[in-house]
Amino acid sequence: MKQGLSQKELAFISKLELREKYFFVRDDIRSNFASDNEMNVYIHRLKKKGRVIKLNKSKYFLVPIKAVGQKWSEYPFILIDEIMNGEDYWIAGKAAAHYWKLIDQIPFEFLVFTPKKYGVMKIFNIRINFKRKRKKNFPKIVERKIRGHKFIIASKKESLQWK
């Protein structure tokens, strides 16, 4: 059984979509609710309905209303940057080699080195493997943009090892 959206859920989803703010924090929607408890209830309901996905402790992703059957995909590099809050990470492995056109194979897994977190995360059928590495051991990295959003990736020279 499919659940629809309530009037209040639809109101703040529409506000976020009008501002094209698909990645949001709790402060972005706080004005729509009387209390933090009410906000937590609505976020929980939307997570159950598949309209909101929690990326990290404070950041969420809003699946747009225009997504058919609640199926949506986002650029993996943008997703990784948002999960890591834009700092202390670099994308490596087959994903970096594919980005630099060193290999033709589309990567199954996105390898991300960071001093903060580790483990495997799966969002939108994208498998992200976080591995720990000290910041002093980071190789030469490059900042690039995709759809106006910056992300950090291993340099072309560093990506040759995953060719």
Task: Report the location of each language-model feature.
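Short, intrinsically disordered/low-complexity patches at protein termini
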Residues: 48-49, 77-79, 94, 129-131, ...
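Phosphate-handling catalytic interfaces
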Residues: 98-163
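Generic detection of long, well-ordered alpha-helical segments
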Residues: 33-36, 86-90, 158-163
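Active-site nucleotide-donor binding segment shared across nucleotidyl transfer reactions
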Residues: 51-68, 88-114
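Helix N-cap / beta->alpha transition motif
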Residues: 25, 92, 153-157
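Short beta-edge/loop segments at beta->alpha junctions of small alpha/beta modules
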Residues: 2-86, 123
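A general, composition-driven signal for non-globular sequence regions
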Residues: 48, 88, 139-141
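Short amphipathic alpha-helical surface micro-motifs
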Residues: 4-7, 41-44, 72-73, 91-95, ...
